Amino acid sequence: MSLTANCSFDLSVSDDFVGKRSGYIHIGDSTNNSGWALHSVPITSVKNGKGPRVLVLSGNHGDEYEGQTASLDLARRLEVEDVKGEILIIPVLSILASAAGTRLWPDGTNFNRVFPGKVDGTIAEKLAYFLSHDLFPTCDSVIDQHSGGRSMHFIPSITMVWVSNVELRNEMLRQSLMCKSEFTILGGEQPSTNPDSLLPGDVVRQGKAVATGEFGGSGVTTAQSMAVISSSLENYLRGMGVYVGKDVAASVYADSIDHPGKIIDSRDYSVSFASASADGIYENRVDLHQQVQAGDLVGLIHDFKSADNKVIEVRARRSGIVALVRGYSPVTTGDVVCMIGELFPSIEAFEKSLEEKSAR
């Protein structure tokens, strides 16, 4: 249990408790302007007796506003009669980064790389410790909503890491598909990164399912991205049995797509990612949803300092659908500028492909 962070209302009420409460996760701080200070993160609980407890998270990175907007809207409109069990909502995890319009906290912390946190660490580490030790163990499931932020732009979609635990993987896949998004992107672990240091990785380490999504990017909300994330969140909560209210968002989005449940397989990052090989100004030469072949031109890097130097071409390393493009033009060497995956019309088609490959 954390000794340096606490909730302003009781999180351990009885199963029969009924009520809607809003408050803060308070984290002890001391600054130049306030010797005795609290860093306060908003949290809302809507509980209606016995049932699952589901934790809704967003704002893990400050410049990913789609999830923050959807979660704030959910926290405002949820009433007790909409819920069976408890929905906990932390809409803006990284408040300082969100206010600054940056991915990272002002001190340079990437909140999605500090788990399981430290009880006596920085503010970010204390918050991560509270989540990892006080909240995650008490929840039946967690949804962590992301987007590409300022630097990237995804097809608004549910995403899922292909974890090694088969039983947990199947449950995560089930939860991902219950969101009824048009696209679910399957990926591997991020290269050169400790998966347990990520918020979703810490949930998985504890043997619990986590749902995630990349709902757009470029540091903006769009009508499409908000439709996808709002309906996916509503469908997820309904599928978990904790939301029993009206279809506020899901029915609107359902009318705008031809077929939910398409799968984009980008698990092999060695060929799915295209990266900048030099510093410069990046020009996208493909759009989201576009089909490309291995070797196709996906982007150009222009030299900042000279119009005489030739542009550097960035080419696809595999065939498939473009699932991510660059959202912010300046790039440095190694920045991911495009992601391509193999498109399947359904989970059944994807699973059939896996069976065929394993039989070879």
Describe these PLM feature segments:
Residues 1-360:
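Structured catalytic-domain cores with a bias toward divalent-metal coordination
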